[in-house]
């Protein structure tokens, strides 16, 4: 039973008349949903699902419409050789590099290069959806081990103990996996932004690699070769503080190892009664760890990262949604040509000639 149906059943209004048995106490229902210990996690998941299922799907659609605005897309793609889609991208393609290059040598027409590019770009967009799914999975497992809701202020704790074992290590691994997976979305989206801006420079008679690879495109606030509109306030490329936080945690974990080598989880108490379960994270200023010389992990701010994380994810996801939607809008703005039946026929004939060359 899903959580919504559970609460609807639980809080059905017992005072309702026999003629209206479906009434239930909406006020109690809303309060129960809000008070649920995982309410913030549910809200994060809803936003992440919206990013994946609405914004990213919209990006797929806008790319399809832009790249193939002058042909009958379905007719052409349905005849395209399977290796164009899978080889070098997916385990569905099982040939070697040598065979792939032989296939390419026989596929002379630019239509093959354009569809190879299409699937190259598609794989980056699909990778974003994969990272979103990973974040949701890691978050779900993480909050089975520690709570996202604190019941006390830090100054109220009267005692506490530090635990470090398999369960605590698992919690830290999941937490850092969230940071790594989420921050990788920034890099992937940077590649797509570069591709959108530089597309007109492609010559599909001689396509070898994507511009984002040549440019070594990775996320950074001063990234070049993206549309100026992507540097509006509220979008990814304006260096929002919450994005810097994800970058800081990711980079520390990837390049320097765990920021807590003991994988500590703190079990607090108030007047001898169990209180909050906490993972503390280092002090931060403007999205960066506070540093002094060689040290960058100070713990004076009482940062309870398991409580802060849901808001971080929500804030960053809203930024990503706006950014993805703007990239989609840029593709749509350049989708101005009508379908050309002659070009569609040319592409289909080129594919037919390719198949004949294999005989």
Mark where each language-model region is.
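A short mid-domain helix/strand-loop element embedded in enzyme catalytic domains
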Residues: 132-169, 179, 187
């Amino acid at each position: 039973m899903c959580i919504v149906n559970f609460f609807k059943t639980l809080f059905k209004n017992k005072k309702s008349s026999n003629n209206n048995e479906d009434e239930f106490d909406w006020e109690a229902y809303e309060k129960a949903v809000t008070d649920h210990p995982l309410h913030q996690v549910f809200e994060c998941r809803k936003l992440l699902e919206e990013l994946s299922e609405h914004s990213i799907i919209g990006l797929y659609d806008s790319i399809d419409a832009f790249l193939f605005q002058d042909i009958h897309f379905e007719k052409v793609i349905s005849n395209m050789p399977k290796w164009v889609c899978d080889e070098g991208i997916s385990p569905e393609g099982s040939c070697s590099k040598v065979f792939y290059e032989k296939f390419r040598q026989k596929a002379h027409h630019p239509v093959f290069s354009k569809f190879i590019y299409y699937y190259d770009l598609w794989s980056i967009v699909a990778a974003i959806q994969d990272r979103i799914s990973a974040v949701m999975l890691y978050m779900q497992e993480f909050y089975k081990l520690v709570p996202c809701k604190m019941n006390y202020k830090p100054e109220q704790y009267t005692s506490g103990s530090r635990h470090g074992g398999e369960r605590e290590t698992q919690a830290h691994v999941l937490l850092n996996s969230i940071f790594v997976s989420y921050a990788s979305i920034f890099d992937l989206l940077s590649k797509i932004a570069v591709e959108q801006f530089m597309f007109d420079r492609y010559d599909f008679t001689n396509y070898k690699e994507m511009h984002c690879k040549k440019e070594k495109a990775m996320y950074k606030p001063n990234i070049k070769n993206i549309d100026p509109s992507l540097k509006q306030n509220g979008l990814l490329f304006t260096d929002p503080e919450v994005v810097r936080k994800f970058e800081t945690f990711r980079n520390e974990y990837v390049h320097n190892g765990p920021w807590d080598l003991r994988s500590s989880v703190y079990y607090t108490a108030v007047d001898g009664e169990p209180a909050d379960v906490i993972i503390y994270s280092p002090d931060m200023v403007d999205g960066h760890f506070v540093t002094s010389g060689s040290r960058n992990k100070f713990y004076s701010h009482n940062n309870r990262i398991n409580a802060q994380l849901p808001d971080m994810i929500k804030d960053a996801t809203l930024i990503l949604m706006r950014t993805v939607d703007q990239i989609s809008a840029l593709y749509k703005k350049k989708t101005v040509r009508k379908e050309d039946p002659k070009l569609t026929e040319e592409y289909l004939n080129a594919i037919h000639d390719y198949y004949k060359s294999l005989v």
